[in-house]
A protein has these predicted regions:
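FAD-binding core of flavoproteins
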Residues: 1-65, 75, 168-173, 177-190
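C-terminal helix-coil-helix/basic helical segment that borders enzyme active sites and/or dimer interfaces
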Residues: 64-78, 91-124, 137-145
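Active-site lining segments that contact anionic ligands and/or coordinate catalytic metals
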Residues: 9-11, 31, 43, 82, ...
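Conserved catalytic-core motifs characterized by acidic clusters
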Residues: 2, 24-41, 66-80, 104, ...
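Alpha-helix capping/hinge segments and adjacent helical runs
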Residues: 119-190
């Protein structure tokens, strides 16, 4: 068992002991399977990004509703600068994630494998989701931490976003490799 909600099915481990595939049943050349499966990873990672962006936005809706009605020392929490800064920070992180996700999708539509664009989107959106859930919990205080809230569920779910389909550190290593290999071309838009 792993931490976090598994309503979506989760992941599992398969073990093949002594499996032999007759040559007439082999679909590709030996060793080509990983490359073939990686073709679907870009679009799949963007699908994760889209779902995570929705969760991050939901965290902000819940947080805004709460701080809009909750008062502390006679002042609505929404009127406090410290709260506004937290909400504004998350809003801009979500928007950056949206733009990176749309750009990566556009690159895929152009026939590009978009490996660096997908990596950028995956890292940014996973971090934005984790941050959005964390801020929503913080703004709601102990109530936000309760297992009775959607935000608590999203927080546990969101933590896995920085691990599944490649840990954030792996994607950052991929980006560093692209920067080294492409030089100034790394920054080209199209």
């Amino acid at each position: 068992p792993i931490m976090g909600p598994e309503e979506h099915g989760g992941h599992c481990e398969l073990e093949f002991d002594g499996l032999e595939v007759p040559m007439e049943n082999v679909l590709m050349n030996e060793g080509d399977g990983l490359r073939a499966t990686q073709i679907r990873l870009g679009p799949a990672r963007l699908t994760h990004c889209m779902r995570w962006l929705g969760f991050a936005k939901r965290c902000m809706e819940i947080a805004q509703e709460y701080v809009g009605r909750r008062e502390g020392f006679g002042i609505k929490l929404a009127d406090r600068e410290s709260v506004q800064i937290k909400l504004g920070d998350v809003a801009h992180q979500i928007q950056i994630g949206r733009l990176l996700t749309m750009h990566a999708a556009w690159k895929l539509d152009q026939g590009d494998r978009a490996r660096k664009e997908v990596s950028m989107a995956k890292v940014q959106v996973a971090d934005a989701l984790h941050h959005a859930a964390d801020v929503a919990i913080q703004l709601q205080g102990a109530r936000g931490y309760s297992k009775d809230t959607v935000v608590e569920w999203i927080y546990r779910y969101g933590r896995s976003a920085r691990l599944v389909d490649g840990a954030s550190e792996v994607h950052k290593m991929v980006l560093a490799r692209f920067m080294r290999e492409e030089g100034r071309d790394f920054w080209k838009w199209g």
